[in-house]
């Protein structure tokens, strides 16, 4: 696997792109259910099929630049093609996330994260997912 990603940030905006290619006699193996540590490890799709080529574009915004610290937005689009199955197949995924972490007061560190995933593939049936996460940061030291 050869994988690379570049990002550029300015005034609260972050723009990025990446490319990944796999080669060999099979897709990337998962050992004991391990996770792939690559930008292609998206919300639903993994983009690690035999000979698959994947490109990704992403955008993020930190609303602290507008005076709203703790509020962030990000979105990304991944497109994989030339993966081998019984035929040459393709897949794509679009992810979006809106998150907020309370910055001060009684609930400082409490966060809520809304995620939307849309996945389409020739490998399997397409899937959409909406998720909500609640987090709480606790300083140990």
Where are these regions (language model features)?
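C-terminal hydrophobic structural anchor segments
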Residues: 52-104
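Residues that define the transmembrane beta-barrel architecture of outer-membrane proteins
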Residues: 2, 46, 51-55, 90-94, ...
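Extracellular loop and loop/strand-boundary signature of outer-membrane beta-barrel proteins
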Residues: 1, 41-46, 81-86, 119-122
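Short loop/turn motifs that connect adjacent beta-strands in outer-membrane beta-barrel proteins
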Residues: 11-12, 64-71, 103-112, 125, ...
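Flexible, solvent-exposed coil segments and beta strand-coil junctions
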Residues: 33-41, 77
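Membrane-embedded beta-strand positions of outer-membrane beta-barrel proteins
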Residues: 6, 15-17, 59, 73-75, ...
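Outer-membrane beta-barrel "beta-signal"
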Residues: 57, 96-100, 126-141
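Outer-membrane beta-barrel pore domains and translocons
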Residues: 1-3, 20-22, 62, 76-80, ...
């Amino acid at each position: 696997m050869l994988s690379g990603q570049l990002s550029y940030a300015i005034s609260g905006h972050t723009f990025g792109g990446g490319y990944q290619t796999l080669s060999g006699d099979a897709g990337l193996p998962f050992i004991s259910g391990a996770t792939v540590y690559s930008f292609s490890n998206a919300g639903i799709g993994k983009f690690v099929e035999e000979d698959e080529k994947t490109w990704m574009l992403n955008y993020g915004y930190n609303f602290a630049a507008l005076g709203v610290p703790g509020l962030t937005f990000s979105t990304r689009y991944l497109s994989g093609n030339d993966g081998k199955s019984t035929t040459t197949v393709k897949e794509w995924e679009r992810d979006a996330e809106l998150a907020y972490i309370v910055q001060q007061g009684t609930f400082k560190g409490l966060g809520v994260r809304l995620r939307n995933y849309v996945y389409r593939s020739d490998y399997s049936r397409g899937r959409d997912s909406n998720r909500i996460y609640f987090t709480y940061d606790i300083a140990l030291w």
